[in-house]
Amino acid sequence: MDIWKPEIKYLRYTNGFNVSELEDACFKFNYKFPKVGYCRVPSHAWCRNQGSFCATLTLYGKSKHYDKYFGVITGFTAFANTVEEAVNKLVFLAVDFITWRRQELNVYG
């Protein structure tokens, strides 16, 4: 089987479904505004058994000066049989990670 990953040129972006919850978390904890993309998974891809659609997001950090970004913190990919399920799963994972990371960083000051 060929290795497959979502490519930027094939992604469509959305702010529907529960993306507003993710936008709120990113704004609250000082991350770059999220761009959630989704695409159809090809039938020959190794991950097709995970679902027909893929949603993806790369999380970027922001500096305290608000004009520079730290760069990539992590990336998220979620698979499901509908676009809505994939995006909702991605938003849940990303918001959960953002709140977990905030709690862990607060432990160290």
Swiss-Prot record:
Changing K5R: In strain: Isolate Yoo. It comes from the Viruses. Changing A45V: In strain: Isolate Yoo. Pfam families: Corona_NS12-7. Belongs to the coronaviruses ns12.7 protein family. This is Non-structural protein of 12.7 kDa. It comes from Bovine coronavirus (strain Quebec).
